Amino acid sequence: MKNPKRGKQLLRFEGFGLDHKNLETVLATDIDALIDVRDRILIVFEAKLDGKEVPKGQKYALQRLIGNAKAAGKHAIAIVVDHDVYDMDEDVYLAGLIAREVFTSEDMCWKPMKRKMTARELANWYVDRYFDG
């Protein structure tokens, strides 16, 4: 991160809404990390505290992002990882977080992890599997 202090600044969604009459329930969401591997592979991370569920709307957004990447001819994976850092003044390091579930462009459904892998291990495995460059 180029500016860690700026990273601690919240982007607030209050007051943000779409003005179309049929979209009053559309809410903004965030993504914790996104890696684009040379416009061929998209890796998206969502980190949750101690097994907290990913909200339904956020899951839908991740699914659509992966589906859109697939439609554009890319391999893509959304990875939900868990952390146990309760102190909000303490940083959370993505590389060592344990992956809980994934949504891939190959399967287009959420699947729990079959074996224990860190975020870094899973991202590297996915790139090794699908990157041909």
Q: Which residues are covered by each model-predicted region?
A:
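Amphipathic alpha-helical interface segments used for dimerization/assembly
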Residues: L65-I66
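Helix-rich interaction surfaces within compact, conserved domain-sized segments
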Residues: D91-G133
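Acidic-basic catalytic patches of nuclease active cores, encompassing PD-(D/E)XK
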Residues: M1-T29, A119-G133
